[in-house]
């Protein structure tokens, strides 16, 4: 009797497995479905207008537009592609992985000199501060002699580092320029006392000031406006792309208007989510105005070109 029950149980088990196998997709079918889904997503992504952004405050209008649904998704698929370093943003733009980005004038002028077509959409409110480690006892730029200064190559921070060194006639060979591309890593190295000085933009500069690190120079004092939003001319020349940029422009303007009306701290939760800010840093952020309708000034283009041609 026990043997008969056992035989019935095994038979039912085999039937169940057979039914499940017949109903469920085979491994090969699952692979084909997965490949088809990946292809679908790739096609959607390739058709979308992709904008490179970093965890810096010049990108805040884009983050707000995305979070608040200010980009008209019925008319255009606009996607933000997140990076930790501007050098990676520039490379993605060069390789056609993104159509536009929030970046700086030095990087885009360098791309243009390499024959890459650049269309300037907007200037941004980005600025950079040269900050020294309070434990390094560097109180002024002259004391950077034999010190390590973190920056990133072929960029506004690199230009400003040279401006600082030249302003006090330091021997460049005696200031050690260290390439740290990741903006958050650069800040952590200052807070961990691994660097003597560095160029920082917001909100990283605010965090540095909160920890009593000293500001030696501010790019605004030099009269330079180096932050830009730029698009690849190659990736945006057809009518569909132009329509997407029009939709992007409307969303960007609406986000700037909201930020200017309400102030950035009104969007505290977004700032905490995107920039990983604690309350102390959030409350210490400076008031900022976000403009639109401006393209780079010729004097700033000339400054970038002159530095690149050195």
Model-identified regions with their sequence ranges:
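Bacterial N-terminal signal peptides that target proteins for export
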Residues: 2-10
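Short, glycine-/small- and polar/acidic-enriched structural segments
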Residues: 26-171, 177-178, 189, 196-202, ...
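Pocket-lining segment of extracytoplasmic ligand-binding domains
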Residues: 105-107, 177-271
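Proline/Glycine/Serine-rich low-complexity intrinsically disordered segments
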Residues: 135-142, 165-167, 173-175, 187, ...
């Amino acid at each position: 009797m026990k043997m008969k029950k056992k035989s019935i149980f095994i038979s039912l088990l085999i039937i169940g497995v057979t039914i499940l196998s017949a109903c469920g997709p085979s491994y090969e079918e699952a692979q084909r479905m997965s490949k088809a889904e990946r292809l679908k997503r790739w096609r959607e992504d390739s058709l979308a207008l992709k904008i490179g952004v970093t965890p810096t405050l010049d990108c805040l209008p884009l983050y707000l537009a995305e979070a608040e649904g200010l980009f008209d998704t019925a008319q255009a698929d606009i996607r933000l592609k997140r990076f930790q370093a501007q050098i990676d943003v520039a490379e993605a733009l060069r390789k056609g992985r993104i159509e536009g980005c929030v970046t700086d004038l030095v990087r885009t002028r360098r791309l243009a000199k390499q024959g890459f077509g650049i269309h300037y959409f907007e200037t941004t409110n980005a600025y950079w501060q040269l900050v020294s480690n309070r434990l390094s006892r560097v109180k002024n730029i002259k004391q950077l002699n034999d010190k390590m200064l973190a920056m990133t190559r072929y960029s506004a921070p690199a230009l400003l580092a040279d401006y600082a060194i030249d302003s006090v006639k330091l021997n460049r060979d005696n200031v050690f320029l260290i390439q740290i591309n990741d903006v958050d890593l650069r800040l952590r190295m200052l807070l961990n006392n691994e660097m003597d000085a560095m160029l920082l933009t917001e909100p990283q500069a605010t965090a540095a000031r909160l920890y009593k690190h000293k500001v030696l120079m501010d790019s605004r004092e030099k009269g330079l406006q180096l932050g830009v939003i730029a698009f690849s001319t190659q990736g945006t020349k057809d009518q569909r792309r132009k329509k997407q940029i029009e939709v992007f422009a409307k969303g960007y303007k609406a986000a700037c208007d909201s930020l200017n009306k309400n102030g950035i701290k009104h969007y505290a939760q977004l700032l905490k989510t995107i920039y990983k800010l604690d309350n102390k840093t959030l409350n210490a952020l400076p008031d900022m105005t976000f403009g639109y309708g401006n393209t780079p000034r010729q004097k700033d283009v000339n400054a970038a070109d002159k530095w690149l041609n050195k």
